[in-house]
């Protein structure tokens, strides 16, 4: 049976051809290799129509033009030559669209990304809607690739080389007004008249390309170009630490096209695309993409979720304010905040105001839309307005008695169906639910700070939590724009449990004489966004170390922090960035001043600050402990699968995405190699490095995680 076409042609009475894109059976349009013949058949018909005046590409999907190429198509390539051939096929198709003798216009609404934008760039003009859902970008770098269907050659010539480099190197997505300002689109119109506006543009002569700004014209010349590529190359190397080969290839390919002409540029683009598709970095990044897509589809349990019409939040602090923001402004649900202090409510409301006002200033949001979203948030110092809330998120201090009191108050003041979700980072959910009248409706919902930026949430059912409570909480997390993983109710849950030994080891190396900046730089070089010492300063030393005694009590001395170090730091009133002094010193708030290591930290903890370890040795000690603990979590079913373990580490603590997560990384090294490294470290530094039993067994049998445990472990 022949597959229905994703592209349909309709020639209007005014001789404008409208090509409608609608991939059968899919929510979003993505480009597949088999579509090439469909488009070529349409191009043949268009060339044969001598009365044709213009062509418009438009999507039939409600909220996307084309979201990019189908990633499976790339994953199915076995060799660089196959992936290169795929790119050349895409380039050829775009060239045929561009070569049509009449004006070709892309009518864009919703996501126009990757191959979708490359198709739009091959058109002679572009019109897009002013809808917030409309975004344009080339995000291939986030998958360890580069645009392979002409994007590296067409975009710099259209909007200028420096602007194009920023878009392609970062995967940055532009809104409609930004795209218009840069000359990426020719017009921005309301959704209701998109087709009419595109048709009118198609009836005119081909839109002439806008002259580039003087700065861009200078940078396109040989001298300006040499300076620009040297400067951008240096900046990119600093940012990526050489861990992402795609960025260097992007620079090379764009420079080749500008220096040697488009023919050489297209050739270099296809070749680089093929080679990058086979790199371990791209394979790891694509695996993360597939895994996160699966997690977003996972309902969490077999039960249907309960309806969610409104949410309550207990506590207006930093976490409460952030949770209120994502609930109202991302999930679109009415939120009522309860705090014993009116200032707490004001703080939470200001948090959302600041976030939304920033969007208004950047012209990402209309003032009227800001006001509409803010109107969803209200506050109270008692339980008025809580009677019919479907789910209450508790975000008060980490105190068990206080949280148990909150459960009792919610059960007394809210409906019988109301779910109680605790944003605890360390307390057992079973203990919080211990005196509950309806323990089946008590669950953990652990957000990470800052709430609006961190994509992960941990959902923690205790043994008595109902399947419907799990499903409803997962549903809320997804509405809030989060990636949820369901984890077992054991001390530290998953993310904090694998993070604690990593940070502990960094502190231990400090006491041995390694310098703060050397430890942090070593882990940044390894691929983490910030080093462990800086991370502790950012989170707050008091907050970040609170969980260590909990973990030590649960799992023994492998979680013990170096004796007296943490207490010495806290007794010296060092909390990190929030009070201006931690391991680093911070300038006055509001002033841009570079943080500096406080030299007083070394005598305070009885260290010399004269280290002997190389950067790889520092990274090895921190990372190996994290890997070992992740495997223990899988063994104890703290995480349901290796998929959740990799996603949790990448999205929760910034484990290097190009390594694919702890389990993919162990697979790439081989369990035998990991065990050998850990045994060597155990001999040198102590029993905390002893590899767990599962790793040793896998090493003996030559097993890997993703080939043996790719499905959920219940």
Curated annotation (Swiss-Prot):
The keyword Calcium belongs to this UniProt entry's keyword annotation: no
Reaction(s) the record says it catalyses: a (3S)-3-hydroxyacyl-CoA = a (2E)-enoyl-CoA + H2O; a 4-saturated-(3S)-3-hydroxyacyl-CoA = a (3E)-enoyl-CoA + H2O; a (3S)-3-hydroxyacyl-CoA + NAD(+) = a 3-oxoacyl-CoA + NADH + H(+); (3S)-3-hydroxybutanoyl-CoA = (3R)-3-hydroxybutanoyl-CoA
Record InterPro entries: 3-OHacyl-CoA_DH_CS, 3-OHacyl-CoA_DH_NAD-bd, 3HC_DH_C, 6-PGluconate_DH-like_C_sf, ClpP/crotonase-like_dom_sf, Enoyl-CoA_hydra/iso, FA_oxidation_alpha_subunit, FadJ
Biological process annotations from GO: fatty acid beta-oxidation
Record keywords: Cytoplasm, Fatty acid metabolism, Isomerase, Lipid degradation, Lipid metabolism, Lyase, Multifunctional enzyme, NAD, Oxidoreductase
Pathway: Lipid metabolism; fatty acid beta-oxidation
Residue segments, region 3-hydroxyacyl-CoA dehydrogenase: 306-714
Site, Important for catalytic activity: residue positions: 118, 140
Record bears the keyword Cell wall biogenesis/degradation: no
EC number assigned by the record: 4.2.1.17, 5.1.2.3, 1.1.1.35
HAMAP family given in the database record: FadJ (MF_01617)
Sequence similarity: In the N-terminal section; belongs to the enoyl-CoA hydratase/isomerase family.
Cited function: Catalyzes the formation of a hydroxyacyl-CoA by addition of water on enoyl-CoA. Also exhibits 3-hydroxyacyl-CoA epimerase and 3-hydroxyacyl-CoA dehydrogenase activities.
PANTHER family xrefs: TRIFUNCTIONAL ENZYME SUBUNIT ALPHA (PTHR43612), TRIFUNCTIONAL ENZYME SUBUNIT ALPHA, MITOCHONDRIAL (PTHR43612:SF3)
Protein name, entry field: Fatty acid oxidation complex subunit alpha
Organism name: Escherichia coli O6:H1 (strain CFT073 / ATCC 700928 / UPEC)
